[in-house]
């Protein structure tokens, strides 16, 4: 009987810890369903880091997507080894293709004769998407965009 009591107390403590852990788990608010370009309309802020035509650098891009997944007001503020601090306005960001699971391709212009093709993955709740350049020679960019 005495041995049973020694086992019951730790068992109760473990059970209470499990109940507490389950109660504190945050449930996902991600919506289920197909992701479309229209889901992404609105203001975005994207950060990029990597190696490009100006060497290693970072860039902050702001843009407003319309319901078709296009923006013509992209502003890029960059800081790089080769070009220093620059600002480029009137650029485009366009979602070229987007699968129902949020995987797709986007294009970002950065002035005359300058642009990137980015692979993207939209989060299930449509609040962010990551980007990576895996197609443009000598450009190695990665980043994330946040819906504002």
Predicted regions and their residues:
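Bacterial N-terminal signal peptides that target proteins for export
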Residues: 3-14
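Bacterial N-terminal signal peptides
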Residues: 13-22
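Mature soluble binding/inhibitory domains
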Residues: 24-148
């Amino acid at each position: 009987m005495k041995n049973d009591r020694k086992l019951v107390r730790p068992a109760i403590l473990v059970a209470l810890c499990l109940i507490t852990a389950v109660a504190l788990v945050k449930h996902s608010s991600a919506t289920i369903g197909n992701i479309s370009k229209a889901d992404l309309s609105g203001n975005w802020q994207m950060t990029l880091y990597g190696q490009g035509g100006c060497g290693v650098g970072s860039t902050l891009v702001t843009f407003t997507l319309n319901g078709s997944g296009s923006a013509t007001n992209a502003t890029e503020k960059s800081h790089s080894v080769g070009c220093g601090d620059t600002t480029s306005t009137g650029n485009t960001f366009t979602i070229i293709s987007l699968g129902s699971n949020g995987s797709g391709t986007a294009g970002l212009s950065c002035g005359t004769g300058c642009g990137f093709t980015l692979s993207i993955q939209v989060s299930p709740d449509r609040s962010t998407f990551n980007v990576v350049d895996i197609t443009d020679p000598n450009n190695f960019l990665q980043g994330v965009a946040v819906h504002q």
